[in-house]
Amino acid sequence: MLLWGRWKVVAGLAGLALSLELLLRYMRRRKPIREVLFFPAPVTCIEPVLYPMKQCSCPLPHTDSAFSRLLLLLLRAQRSLELCVFTFSCPSLARAVLLLHSRGVRVRVITDNDYMAASGSQIGPLRSAGVAVRHDQSSGYMHHKFAVVDGTVVLTGSLNWTVQATQTNRENILITDDRVIVKAYQQEFERLWQEYDPASYDFFPEKENK
């Protein structure tokens, strides 16, 4: 019985070692995400991206583009999507965000207070749908343009979430799953999320004594 018990221990340790080896091999084989998207992007049909099971017969080109790639990366979110964007007026990007929200993905948005009510802003529709939105309360701009997908991938660059930026301007987005970089952006988002908590706003600041 004692010998059999020892063999069970040895077999268990061997199985654990094999599992760890397989895990390490998988991690080494996993291709890191290192990608750059450049804009402007050609106008293409995005319906197959948003709804892959539906057919679309619109006259727009049904081809890949930097914009469709951006949508695909965002729609990968399974648990959470944190957006920190200066201005958000692109209806197609709003559709993607609302689609994630409808799937139960936790979506949080931080934006600039001066631009959230600008003409064409999508912040109102997002809030109406129940998406959590916070904004700054300062004279300086909240000028970030980044997104964190599931806490594992960061999309960051010069791109404002506007039609002009995606279709007209020279812009870029860097995508990476580097853990150090993702952690830094996640921490910055959480820091701003707490800083912009409406409960901490001073709506009636006292005038300085002169």
UniProtKB/Swiss-Prot annotation:
Active-site residues (renumbered): H143, K145, D150
Report the membrane topology from the UniProt record: Single-pass membrane protein
Q: Which principal EC class is assigned to this enzyme? A: hydrolase
- Residues forming the PLD phosphodiesterase domain are 138-165
One matching Pfam family is PLDc_2
Q: Which UniProt keywords are listed?
A: Differentiation, Endonuclease, Hydrolase, Lipid degradation, Lipid metabolism, Meiosis, Membrane, Metal-binding, Mitochondrion, Mitochondrion outer membrane, Nuclease, Spermatogenesis, Transmembrane, Transmembrane helix
A Gene Ontology annotation in the biological process aspect, one of them, is:
mitochondrial fusion
Question: Which Gene3D superfamilies is this protein grouped with?
Answer: Endonuclease Chain A
Going by the entry's taxonomy, the superkingdom of the source organism is recorded as Eukaryota
Entry EC number(s): 3.1.-.-, 3.1.4.-
What's its catalytic activity? a cardiolipin + H2O = a 1,2-diacyl-sn-glycero-3-phospho-(1'-sn-glycerol) + a 1,2-diacyl-sn-glycero-3-phosphate + H(+)
Those parts of the protein on the Cytoplasmic side are: 25-210
Q: Name one GO cellular component term.
A: mitochondrial outer membrane
Q: What ranges does the Mitochondrial intermembrane topological domain annotation cover?
A: 1-6
Zinc-finger recorded as keyword = no
Where, subcellularly, is it found? Mitochondrion outer membrane
Membrane-spanning ranges: 7-24
According to the UniProt entry, its GO molecular function terms are: cardiolipin hydrolase activity; endonuclease activity; metal ion binding; protein homodimerization activity
Q: Which SMART domains match?
A: PLDc (SM00155)
Q: Please explain the role this protein plays, according to its UniProt record.
A: Presents phospholipase and nuclease activities, depending on the different physiological conditions. Plays a key role in mitochondrial fusion and fission via its phospholipase activity. In its phospholipase role, it uses the mitochondrial lipid cardiolipin as substrate to generate phosphatidate (PA or 1,2-diacyl-sn-glycero-3-phosphate), a second messenger signaling lipid. Production of PA facilitates Mitofusin-mediated fusion, whereas the cleavage of PA by the Lipin family of phosphatases produces diacylgycerol (DAG) which promotes mitochondrial fission.
Quote the entry's note on domains: In contrast to other members of the phospholipase D family, contains only one PLD phosphodiesterase domain, suggesting that it has a single half-catalytic and requires homodimerization to form a complete active site.
Q: Which family does it belong to?
A: Belongs to the phospholipase D family. MitoPLD/Zucchini subfamily.
Subunit and partners: Homodimer.
What protein name applies here?
Mitochondrial cardiolipin hydrolase
The species this protein belongs to is Xenopus tropicalis
* Protein encoded by which gene: pld6
